[in-house]
């Protein structure tokens, strides 16, 4: 054996809440970013999602995600809406599923002009990490840097709480990835090396993932509760 490589979907995989100012714009960009990193997106919060502030706060508390991706606003644009979203997260004071004594990882990938205010709101209550804006201008997404941060925090905050993780790390020759993220990388590698468009399906125990690479653009979507173990009844329904 030349190398041992491991992926993980333990504990239901990487579960995230994402947020954006406009649901159909930065909200969808944040969702694509998290999905492409191998996460299950539990909810998309947005300033215009029709929910009242207390409903958004209660929803964050209820879900207890592994981490939150906070996005919104183009660079140089208004800061008030994304800071408002940060305040909802701070008011919820959410605790991660694993490691109750740890702070919840929050990734900020929104308007760079709002960074100082987001730090003021979330810096003490969460394990806040800042990265490049996932949508710096309306016409362009920039998902790569935030996806890499998600991978890093998955190892540092989520997998580190899993029983046996340290022992498993001694065996592996590469960092442990979320299983959907690893499958996505396989699809992108095939598309790049063969110079073709690729569509792939990964049928798991609880969810089914669809991957595509068209014109070098990668996308992943998740059909929740469609799988081959305890959600098999939904497939057959």
Q: Model-found features: residue ranges?
A:
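Nucleotide/phosphate-binding catalytic cleft detector across ATP-hydrolyzing
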Residues: 1-197
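Glycine-rich phosphate-binding loop of actin/hexokinase-like ATP-binding domains
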Residues: 188-237
